[in-house]
Amino acid sequence: DKESARLHFGLDPDTITLLVTGGSLGAKRINETIEHSRRVLSAAGIQVLHIMGGRSELPEVHEKDYVRIAYCDRMDLAILASSFAVSRAGSSTVSEFSAVGLPAAYVPYPVGNGEQKLNVADVVSGEGGLIVADAEFTEAYVSNTLVPLISNSRALAAMANSAKKVGVADGTARLLALVKGVL
């Protein structure tokens, strides 16, 4: 359950939890913005599970309302523990979050052909997530957009419900049915 998952990371079992991840290598903008927003998040009663990635130079931290680790081998528990997420917009991440109804602010990787924007299009249009450009993911964005949203239990629940409606929780069964249909 959510409470046990939070305890696994040393977090309070009853506090709203923000999951932050930029993927296995990390995301400099996301890491720096969250680092500089720690006080604002804490003051709003939001605890943070920050998975910074392997290339980050930030140290690991284990505080009452802020846990920052380089790598997480239990993403299932990290996702379960969370009320909201901030993340890059890789297809697997978007699929995993939406399948379980985890609303998120997606910060697509700013380099490439724009595929990460496409990955979140359905979730964003279905109101299960937000999209924010890398350059716009700032302390002001966290203070003015994320904190009010995450602090609003009604809006958060609606967003979680919308994310789950867009998500596909039975992808494995669908793929097996497709394979069986071909055989």
What are these model-predicted stretches?
Residues 7, 155-169:
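A short, well-ordered alpha-helix in the C-terminal region of glycosyltransferases
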Residues 104, 122-135, 147-148:
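A short acidic/histidine/glycine-rich donor-binding loop in glycosyltransferase catalytic cores
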Residues 22-24, 165, 178:
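Conserved donor-binding loops in enzymes that form glycosidic bonds
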Residues 96-99, 114-126:
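Short acidic/histidine- and often glycine-rich active-site loop of Leloir-type glycosyltransferases
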Residues 148, 168-183:
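C-terminal alpha-helical cap of glycosyltransferases
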Residues 80-82, 98-107, 126:
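Conserved donor-binding/catalytic loop of nucleotide-activated donor transferases
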Residues 3-7, 11-87, 94, 117-121, ...:
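Donor-nucleotide binding loops and adjacent catalytic segments primarily
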Residues 87, 103-113:
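Short hydrophobic beta-strand element within catalytic cores of glycosyltransferases
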